[in-house]
Amino acid sequence: MLGGCSSDQSLLADTRQQVVEHVAAPFSQSAITLNITAEPGLNSWNDIASSCTVLVIQAQKASSLNRIMSNPAQLKSLYHGTGAEDNILKVDRYTMMPGKRTTLHIDRSEHTRNVAIVAGYYPFPKKQHMALITIPVTLDSSGWWSKSWSAKLSPIIIDLTLGSHSISHLSHYSTQAPDQTHAAQPVTDGKLTQGEE
């Protein structure tokens, strides 16, 4: 009996994972909300604050975004509005001024599963100026004895604070499950890891 329960649990976990992996990723209007706060000393060079352009890059695969973030020539072309790879679904640019706050409502493109944030600090964005975020998935189950699962991509809210020399805060959460907040911490390989607060 216990063995049967254990294999049922394993099957349920596998089914849930398959549903998440194969979730549909349709276009969704204003499904990405980006709250940006720029500190007064934004993008300081020789103690002089200046503007900073933020890229919001959408792609289906995280690997596509990691390739872009580790390729200075491609990043530069994205800042100039040219040269996006076929795997890049959408690029939005917004220039922040020191001491300002703004909220952007960005459409999520069809097939988007991952979003990269790149802040254009002087002289060029480095690892501490980038973040990779996976679009959250909301799971629903129905049935008592035999559960069936359905999944959909959730709208996401990203809170971003731009400090003097790097991103000083980045967190995100789904509007479907507001109690699930994730913070991003810089690591040495160019990605920001996500962990629950």
Model region roles, listed by residue range:
Residues 2-24:
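Bacterial Sec signal peptide processing site at the extreme N-terminus
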Residues 28-32:
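Short structural boundary motif marking the start of a folded domain
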Residues 34-45:
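Short amphipathic, basic-aromatic surface patches that mediate peripheral association
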Residues 35-37, 55-57, 118-120:
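Residue-level recognition of well-ordered beta-strand positions that form the cores
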Residues 43-47, 105-107:
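Short histidine-centered beta-strand/loop micro-motifs
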Residues 46-55:
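Short coil-to-beta strand junction motifs in C2/discoidin
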Residues 59-129:
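Mid-length scaffold segments of soluble, non-membrane domains
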Residues 130-197:
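Glycine-rich, aromatic-bearing surface loops/beta-hairpins
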